[in-house]
């Protein structure tokens, strides 16, 4: 980074608070302005069409997707009890209705990363198959699960760097085709995620450093082999577009509940942000399908506010939290990314309404509250969105519209967390809430 630190601190006073690990709220002054965005609605529809072509394959290889006919769909759940408890804990009013977009329940890898990660694997598999064989777009893609294609895919490799969930989604999908699959994992990655990948035949390379280093190492290694495809969490267009297709899905889910976003009926969408690719893709997808009334809010740990910092300063991926002496350490492993993606900040410059940072303790509290009130279990980083609701309500200028507001908290992962691990998360949350611990019944 070439910018003078002292000049940055003077120009953006909130950076001083961020350096002290204080929770901050930032409203993007450029939100809603006109801007050129390098993605289109046609590309989102292309993603949806590709997912549809692969539905027979996914239903064949991953039977859990059969109930949705091979589609990756998660429920949108109204969580009245959690809303009431959240308001009570914060001694605040939360006008409107709160929903959970439960990507934590997505089939295959149980996280938001299923959308982008699996999509990019599918697109690469389609490229190999249509290039090397007579496969056409009108064929039944279930044929890709046959030994003939498995043998073909075994000549190719897929590689990625990850803190955990992206590696899980890509690893499980790529291994199902027979690709030689390698996941470079950062020091923050949970052991159970590494174990699960290895159990699925994936090679895991462990790094005693940040995910940025793991990604760089993976990128360098993949470049040496022309048959190895690297999925780049810091700059992949296909990852971004894979996430964006959810805009089509949630538009229908909202409409089914009588929710049609506009200026008088705002829909706030609270998204945990790590490298920023998945929340940016989701935000773009929602706003391309519903151009009015969508207010994306990113939530990041106070110790790793990389996307907020990059957007606030307009330095985007050119600044890392460590440049300001922030340690980058958090128990929200999926959010432990010291530098934002090359795509996220630039695309979100006018699409992001605001950002909030939180302490790790808060996400454990909300994790436990969600389990107690709604019987829904998520991993720590997936509870991050709850931390941003009250600050966003307080900051929102159009107070009259708040009574018609819809708040969508994006639960980004949790389905695959082992029971003993989830119990530890829950116990920590109950302890922080100063309440008796219970045994979970998932």
Curated annotation (Swiss-Prot):
Cofactor or coenzyme needed: pyridoxal 5'-phosphate
Listed PROSITE patterns: DEHYDRATASE_SER_THR
Enzyme superclass (EC): lyase
Reaction(s) this enzyme catalyzes, per UniProt: D-serine = pyruvate + NH4(+)
Pfam families, sorted: PALP
This enzyme's EC code(s): 4.3.1.18
The keyword Lyase is assigned to this record: yes
Keyword terms: Lyase, Pyridoxal phosphate
Source organism superkingdom: Bacteria
GO molecular function terms attached to this record: D-serine ammonia-lyase activity; hydro-lyase activity; pyridoxal phosphate binding
GO biological process terms on file: D-serine catabolic process; isoleucine biosynthetic process
Residues that bear N6-(pyridoxal phosphate)lysine: 113
NCBIfam families reported in the protein's UniProt record: D_Ser_am_lyase, PRK02991.1
Family named by the database record: Belongs to the serine/threonine dehydratase family. DsdA subfamily.
Name this protein carries in UniProt: Probable D-serine dehydratase
